[in-house]
Structure formats: C-alpha cells, structure tokens
C-alpha cells in the first residue's frame, strides 16, 4: 500500500495531465508475522512510481497518463503489465522529477520498469510473469525488467531477506501466494513487509485539521534531537485528535528511512513518552 504522503504527491504531479479510466489493480495488505507464508514467493518492494501499461499507454495507479518518451515504450507488449518505474534505492524524489515532466527528457534513460504482475493472463503468478519473459527474449534492450521472485521455504527467510534489503537502503519486501489467479483489490495473497525505525521528538506546534478532522488536531509539528522538523499526521486515535498532547511534550514516532535531505520518511505517531 502506498502511503498517504506518496499518494498525495502523485496526485499533484503537474505533468501527468491526461486522464484515463482508473485501472483496476491489486493492492497490498500488511504482513502479519503470525501468518505462515511458507510456499509463497518474496521480492524486494521498490520505492518508485507505479506504472501500469494497459497495452497502449502508461498510466499511474490513479489513471493519469505518464508522458514517457516514444523510444521508451516503443517495444512494449500488446498486453497489460504492472510494476514500478524505478532507478535505484532511496531515489523516490529523483524518479518523481523525471516522471512528472510534461515534456520527457533524456533522464528517462535512467528509468527501468520493474514488473511484478502481468494482469489478465492464465495461471499463477509465475505463469503470468513467464508470458512477459517469453515476450522479452527478443527484446534484450527493453527498459522492462521482471522483479525476481524468491521461494520461501522456511518462515525465517522473510525476516532475513527484509533485513538484507533494509541494510542496502531498500524499502521493504512483498510476499505473494504464487498459486493465486490474477485478482484486483486489496489482497490477502499479496502482503507488504516493512521494517521501521523509531525516534523521539518534541512538539513545537499543533496544526489544525481539515475535512473530517475540522475542529480537531490535523498534525503535530515536532523537532528531533538533531533539530529536524517533522510533520506527523497519522497514527492518532480520535480521542488524541480531540485532546492532543500539549506543546513541549516528547513523543515517539516511527518512520521508514530518510530522504536525501535527512528528513524521516512517512512518519507515524506511536506514543507519548512517559516521564520516569
């Protein structure tokens, strides 16, 4: 599942100007460690921009047309493929700056289309991916790449794989049931696994809410020990939005790595630090 911040960011991309029908895609649920996924497959969860090729054009998750160069999509298949437009780990801002342009430039040569699904094909996940693999055999220079799927033979493999990905600067892991036919919506057979970090900050300002949070707290503006300002708008219960902790309170929040500017990514409130 994409985070709220990322979704809003994508909706505001000025270059994705041409609307199409919103594609019916599959979405990830969150992995529960109590669930056995032995017999499933796992892959790295790439932090890029989702790109859905419907057989004729490249679209965002929300149905906006992505203005990719003609040379980039000239050898795309006549059938649908789904994946992430990606360059390298920890480069979401860089990817966005390339993809959002109305007039695409040469920086698109840094982009690959990392595919995790071939919709509407017969069989399980690996069978569907094999359809694309056969198509790419004579197209070795294609920007289309298939994300490698690793079999899960023992439960501990998921944790070790996640730790290895995070050490390399990756976002997380996706585990999927390879025997399931293609489906859309939020699936119990496709799960995201993330490893988060946490730290403390002091509340500097209480920001008012909008929409359903009108009259309540919308977010907290906090400062970390390193002097970094962080806006935290998720993770709160309704009662906490009605009665937010006062300015000067120290809270703990979780986040998923750092941006290039050193800001915590996707901060989520965890708890108020108890005075001991």
Feature map (PLM): residue ranges:
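N-terminal signal peptide c-region/cleavage motif recognized by signal peptidases
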Residues: 14-16
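Nucleic-acid 5′ end/cap handling module spanning
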Residues: 22-61, 118, 145-263, 267-275
């Amino acid at each position: 599942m994409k985070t709220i911040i990322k979704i809003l960011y994508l909706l505001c991309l000025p270059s994705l100007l041409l609307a199409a029908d919103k594609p019916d895609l599959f979405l990830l649920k969150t992995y529960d460690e109590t669930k056995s996924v032995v017999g499933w497959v796992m892959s790295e969860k790439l932090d890029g921009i989702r790109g859905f090729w419907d057989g004729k054009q490249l679209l965002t998750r929300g149905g906006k047309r992505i203005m990719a160069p003609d040379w980039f999509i000239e050898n795309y298949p006549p059938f649908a493929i789904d994946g992430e437009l990606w360059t390298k780990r920890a480069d979401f801002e860089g990817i966005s700056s390339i993809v959002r342009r109305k007039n695409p430039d040469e920086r698109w040569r840094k982009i690959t289309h990392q595919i995790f699904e071939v919709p509407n094909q017969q069989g399980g996940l690996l069978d569907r991916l094999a359809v694309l693999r056969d198509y790419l055999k004579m197209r070795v220079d294609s920007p289309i790449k298939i994300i490698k799927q690793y079999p899960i033979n023992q439960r501990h493999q998921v944790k070790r794989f996640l730790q290895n990905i995070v050490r390399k600067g990756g976002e997380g892991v996706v585990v999927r049931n390879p025997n399931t036919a293609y489906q859309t919506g939020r699936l119990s057979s496709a799960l995201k696994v993330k490893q988060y970090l946490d730290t403390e900050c002091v509340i500097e300002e209480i920001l008012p809410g909008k929409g359903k949070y009108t009259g309540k707290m919308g977010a907290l503006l906090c400062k970390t020990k390193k002097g970094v300002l962080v806006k935290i708008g998720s993770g709160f219960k309704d009662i906490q939005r009605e009665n937010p902790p006062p300015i000067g309170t120290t809270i703990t929040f979780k986040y998923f790595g750092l941006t290039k500017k050193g800001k915590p990514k996707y901060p989520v409130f965890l708890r108020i630090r108890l005075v001991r």
